[in-house]
């Protein structure tokens, strides 16, 4: 059973789409192993997105991620990383397949509703960034 990190970004939290997005994950067969709402500090956002530090969009991304609360979740399921990315849709909501989260709730490449880990290795790093082992409820399977 794989785990992946999902973040419901400030735009979706602010527009009260949390429940709808969680329902999409659950109806897609994911189990939520951990979840919390928090307001990222500048330091937390910069640390989480440190891999993008040299990219031109870095500061805009940090500013957006600290603009309001986020919901951080550990999703668990078969092939979780790839399936989550499929359910989220393309980074650019205009290119996302109909029915995906970003097609439904995203506005632009920068304001695109959700974040999801892009690999198993990064999922482990990202999960550990936000959650301690005792906060994650593993399935009995």
From Swiss-Prot:
Identify the catalytic residues: 115
- InterPro entries, alphabetically? NDK-like_dom, NDK-like_dom_sf, Nucleoside_diP_kinase, Nucleoside_diP_kinase_AS
Q: Quote the catalytic activity from the record.
A: a 2'-deoxyribonucleoside 5'-diphosphate + ATP = a 2'-deoxyribonucleoside 5'-triphosphate + ADP; a ribonucleoside 5'-diphosphate + ATP = a ribonucleoside 5'-triphosphate + ADP
Query: What cofactor requirement does the entry state?
Result: Mg(2+)
Per UniProt, the keywords (alphabetical) are: ATP-binding, Cytoplasm, Kinase, Magnesium, Metal-binding, Nucleotide metabolism, Nucleotide-binding, Phosphoprotein, Transferase
Record's SUPFAM superfamilies? Nucleoside diphosphate kinase, NDK
Enzyme class, UniProt record, top EC level: transferase
Domain of life of the organism encoding this protein: Bacteria
Q: Which Pfam families match?
A: NDK (PF00334)
Q: Which residues, by range, are in coiled-coil regions? A: none
Would you kindly state one Gene Ontology biological process term found in this protein's UniProt entry? Answer: UTP biosynthetic process
Q: What is its EC number?
A: 2.7.4.6
Q: Where in the cell is it found?
A: Cytoplasm
Q: Which GO terms describe its molecular function?
A: ATP binding; metal ion binding; nucleoside diphosphate kinase activity
What Gene Ontology terms describe where this protein resides (cellular component)? Answer: cytoplasm
**Binding positions (ATP):** 9, 57, 85, 91, 102, 112
Q: Does the keyword Transferase apply?
A: yes
Q: Which PANTHER family match?
A: NUCLEOSIDE DIPHOSPHATE KINASE, NUCLEOSIDE DIPHOSPHATE KINASE DDB_G0292928-RELATED
Q: Which family does it belong to?
A: Belongs to the NDK family.
- Name the NCBIfam families for this protein: PRK00668.1
Give the function comment from the record: Major role in the synthesis of nucleoside triphosphates other than ATP. The ATP gamma phosphate is transferred to the NDP beta phosphate via a ping-pong mechanism, using a phosphorylated active-site intermediate.
Query: How the protein assembles, per its UniProt entry?
Result: Homotetramer.
Q: What is this protein called?
A: Nucleoside diphosphate kinase
What's the name of its gene?
A: ndk
